[in-house]
Amino acid sequence: MSIQQIFAIRMNALAAFLLGVSGVTADATAADAPAAASAATAAPVAGTPVAGAPVASAKKSSEPIVTGPVAGVSGTGDLVLAEGGRTTSVVVVRESAGQWEKRAALDLASYIERIADAKPRVASTPADVAAALANSNSVPTLIVGQAALDADPTLKTALQKASTAAKAAPLLRIDAVAIRRVGQRVYLAGSNDDSHYYAVSELLQRWGCRWYMPGEFGEHIPRHPRLAVGQLDYAYASPFEVRRYWLSWNGDTTGQQEFMRRNFFNEEVVPNGHNLAQFTKELIPPGKSMFNVPISEDRTADHVAGQLEKAFANGERIQLGMEDGIYQSDSAADRQLIALQYDKYFLTQSYTDAFMTFYNKTAQRLLAKHPNSRALIGFLIYSNITLPPVKDITAAKPLVGYFAPIDFDPIHGMDDPRSKPRRECRDIFHRWAKIMQGRLVIYDYDQGMLVWRDLPNPSHQAFRHDVQHYLKAGILGVDTESRGAMATTGLNLFLRGQLLWRPAIDVDGLIAEHYTSFYGPAAEPMAAYWNAIYRVWEETLATEHEYFLAPAIYTPELLATLRARLADANQRLAPLAGRGDAASKRFVERLRFVSLGFAVLENYMAMTRAAATDTDFAAAVAAGERGLAAREQLTAMNPTFTTYKTIGEHGYAWWPGEVKQYQELLPLVNGSKGQLVAKLPLVWNWRRDEKDVGVKENWFRQPIDLAAWNSLPKPIGPAERWALEGKWEQVSADLYLQAQGVLGPDYQSYTGHGWYQTDIELSGAQIAGPLRLKFPGIFNECWLYVNGEMVAHRPFQGVWWMNDYRFEWEVDVAGKFKAGKNSIVIRHHNPHHFGGMFRRPFLYRAVTP
């Protein structure tokens, strides 16, 4: 069943809102409304996949979402906890309870009050607990944590069975919960302090409580005048030992701890970060850096093991991750190992065999002295040690690897036929899982765009598929690096928590439910709004990351769809404006959140179009400043919505830096430093040169033959482009090549040499004076030819992100053009990811100040 179908069913719960908002009462939500007559399905969405693209098969989840005023199977014997604003129920918890065990009891009482207008008493002193348990045959009693385990010791057996079913031999921990109703008693317990809270969260979620984002803004607490527990005997344990996220870039942590427990995250970690240099600094060769130490030599293992021995003997968890960079060793032993394979992603030799030799040697030395130690050594599988080793290596038992595939497609799932990089990542992952014998944690990036622009960046479309691979491989779990920034990440963390706890959960059901509970009367247009975004991310052929791909996702067609849906949503919520009840205020606030997010998105894309497509830098600066102002409003609304305030945004990689770049380009065309002579064409001819024969065959002088291209039916997809077999085709200068469908037959981004060509008519007046050709955005090493003559060469670091983030190239072309028709040819070499132009070039004449 699709999200749209599920949503249509759930819309039946919204009739009171959709037929007349006057029925909204204080603290009521959409969940209270009686059935509606019908609901419209989502409208057609812009941004459909390029013609000829394969479609990924969706793995359907098997566990439906069941919520309501009765937790468990309802019947005549339901245990009523609260009704009509009254309750006699008691929550029992030990006085000596742990932090989250105690918080679980307090939150349970608090949320029951918010759901049913009646707050149970909390008994925690020994005398109060004893009295509550003595009266539990006549009074509804909810017993939390160790108190439940003491009152019903058979719960321990249930927890153990659930734990064994999830993982027979856990390495770090197991998180299990048990919820059982016996007569007037409801037992809620877990296998540890966190799990006691998970048990309470399980119960609350059965009543319909949700925590979509940290803090009060992100929670949905339904209203039930009668709250009960039916027949209920449930025990469960997550198959993943590590279910953690942390906030990088100084993201705002407000509400994080509660959000984590309510969505079943834990804080389990084996330290793995960049710290190797502190143990190898004495081994740095003269005149070299920490990246030049010998790696696989015995002396390195001896040196490091000696420093770790005390911690290892004490059974500690030891951090031993590579430094954040590219290693280059001159050791003869290392050179022999790194010669085994080349890493095409990092454009250097793979150091995995050398590092795994080092890690195993170090671990073996420590184990030889302390064979019974329970110590663990964490390290990163990252940078140029991402590829599995060539040699047949099994990791020594103390080693725990954190697999951090930072430079792989972050958009698609591992089985998606549209992404060769992700399918390669899948195979790499499974190989590492075998090498590590399951002692593997995914170092998960969310959002995966890294340097981004506060635009929606959903990632559940990939994670929901990948988590099934993690389950199959039996790894330890997932450790997510997020920056919070909820306007960007949205439901990503919520869905991660739910999937890591229960991999079979119905993701589509959770998303559909979110619309009704979060947006109330605006649920229908908001479903269409967000489903449009999700669909484009799901179906895009783009596999790259960072803000350059935004125009490939957020097309004018998609923006028009979103604008219309947002207008519809605002119209539906208009009657709620100014109302004082909490529910109305929440719905209005959430729609304002979406509206400000759209203002950020719309203005950023207007800026991009003005600069990249129209060469209108004044308009680009104005749109960029409007977008940044909208972002300020979004941040003022809630500091968890963005992160830029705390990290600072210095340099051209960031949005203010991009606006600054356009401010610096503006004088070149407005007469202060230069006069615009001509915008080069937006559409260029382009040709693959896989065998690098173009120079030898004088492609820079040959006439352009577009016969094959012109014969193709439109629209043209990647398969049709590939079928041209290297003949001339056409591309746009305002978007990098891969996002236009310039791919290999397996949907791998095209790498290698390519040729751009265009003609431009210039008058004698236009070619006079100090003429300069400006490429405001172009990747790769390039060679420029004008009228068959090579006039400039542009060097470029192979890995694109190691270059100046302006990605500009300016060439003095005075005297190179003639009056009349001129040919401009660019030869470029793309070894990695992004290829070609992404901002339209222009000719300008320099003006003397």
Predicted regions and their residues:
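Acidic, contiguous N-terminal accessory segments
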Residues: 30-36, 52-178, 227-233
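Feature activates predominantly on carbohydrate-active enzymes
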Residues: 96, 104-107, 111, 158-360, ...
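Structured mid-domain segments that build the active-site/substrate or prosthetic-cofactor binding neighborhood
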Residues: 292-302, 310, 420-522, 528
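Acidic, His- and aromatic-enriched active-site or binding-groove loops in soluble protein domains
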Residues: 340-359, 395-415, 499-507
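Substrate-binding cleft/loops of secretory-pathway carbohydrate-active enzymes
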Residues: 378-407, 454-459, 486-493
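Catalytic domains of carbohydrate-active enzymes that cleave complex glycans
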Residues: 474, 498-683
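Extended carbohydrate-recognition surfaces in non-catalytic/accessory domains of CAZymes
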Residues: 667-776, 794-809, 823-826, 830-849
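Short strand-turn-strand beta-turns centered on an Asx-Gly dipeptide
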Residues: 785-791
